[in-house]
């Protein structure tokens, strides 16, 4: 069984805003340190950023407006904790403790992701979908159930009726849709809104890529400050993750569909 949400789901909107701010930080420095938390809904977007670079309120507001529309932006920026900053002075080290399990993507997960993308291309609005064997559940906002039934005659469609969705009727928060992003993979922390020094980003990506390459689960553990994980230099893990993010198109882009894209 698998659940997939599209980029217009409020939680993914929060992830995308967080990713956009990380992209901004990387435009200012090659290796910034940044962690972004976003809570959005009902006309307001709260953002707290711990960062080594300064993001102007205008830059932040522009990113929110582009992704989520005209909202009141409540932005709080603080400097990165000095102990965490010191951890990176003499090289790239794991920015936190963590457990990570990369798992190969299943045919079911690929199939549902294809369906989700097809619906998003058509409606470009909030949607959440489940596939469990032969059972397909489609919750698609701003769509007529009858039209969806023509394409998916055997699906359970909008069980409570047609709906509008989005941040006007629901709230969203960063890293709340990791099942959609990662499938059967496991993480102790969130994937989005963080720079590449954060193990939650780089080791998750590395483990997931290795699982796809080998066809078997990959389990890794790290402690904050480690310069190697399972005998692999952490710098190499970070560069592998950087190449993946660059290939996708940046942190905001990677937040749209997660690792299963």
Model-derived segments and spans:
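A domain-level signal for the structural core that forms small-molecule/cofactor-binding pockets
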Residues: 1-261
């Amino acid at each position: 069984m698998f659940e997939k949400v599209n980029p217009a789901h409020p939680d993914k909107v929060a992830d995308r805003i967080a990713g956009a701010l990380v992209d901004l930080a990387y435009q200012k420095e090659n290796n910034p340190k940044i962690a972004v938390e976003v809570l959005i809904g009902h006309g307001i977007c709260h953002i707290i950023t711990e960062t080594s670079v300064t993001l102007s309120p205008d830059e932040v507001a522009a990113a929110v407006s582009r992704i989520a529309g005209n909202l009141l932006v409540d932005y709080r920026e603080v400097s990165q904790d000095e102990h965490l900053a010191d951890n990176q002075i003499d090289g790239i080290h794991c920015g936190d403790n963590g457990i990570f399990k990369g798992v190969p993507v299943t045919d079911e997960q690929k199939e549902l992701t294809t369906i989700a993308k097809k619906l998003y291309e058509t409606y470009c609005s909030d949607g959440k979908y489940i596939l469990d064997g032969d059972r397909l559940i489609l919750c698609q906002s701003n769509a007529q159930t009858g039209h969806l039934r023509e394409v998916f005659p055997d699906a359970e469609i909008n069980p409570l009726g047609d709906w509008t969705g989005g941040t006007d009727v629901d709230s969203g928060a960063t890293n709340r849709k990791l099942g959609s992003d990662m499938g059967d993979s496991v993480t102790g922390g969130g994937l989005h809104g963080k720079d590449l020094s954060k193990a939650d980003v780089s080791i998750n990506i590395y483990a997931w890529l290795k699982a796809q390459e080998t066809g078997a689960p990959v389990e890794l553990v790290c402690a904050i400050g480690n310069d190697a994980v399972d005998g692999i230099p952490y710098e190499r893990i970070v560069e592998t993750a950087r190449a993946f993010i660059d290939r996708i198109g940046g942190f905001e882009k990677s937040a749209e569909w997660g690792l299963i894209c």
